[in-house]
Every structure is written in structure tokens, then in C-alpha cells.
Curated annotation (Swiss-Prot):
Name of the featured protein: Butyrate kinase
Any one of the GO BP annotations: butyrate metabolic process
Main location: cytoplasm
Enzymatic class: transferase
Annotated metabolic or biological route of this protein: Lipid metabolism; butanoate metabolism
Function: Catalyzes the conversion of butyryl-CoA through butyryl phosphate to butyrate.
GO cellular component: cytoplasm
Superkingdom to which the source organism belongs: Bacteria
Family: Belongs to the acetokinase family.
Reactions the enzyme catalyzes: butanoate + ATP = butanoyl phosphate + ADP
Organism: Clostridium pasteurianum
Residue runs in coiled coils: none
Keyword Repeat among UniProt keywords: no
Gene (name only): buk
One GO MF term: butyrate kinase activity
Taxonomic placement: Bacteria, Bacillati, Bacillota, Clostridia, Eubacteriales
Length: 9
């Protein structure tokens, strides 16, 4: 889930 946040800086 938080991986999506890594994609969105």
C-alpha cells in the first residue's frame, strides 16, 4: 500500500 506513496513523491 505505502509503495504507491513511493511512486507519488
Amino acid at each position: 500500500m505505502y509503495k504507491l506513496l513511493i511512486i507519488n513523491p
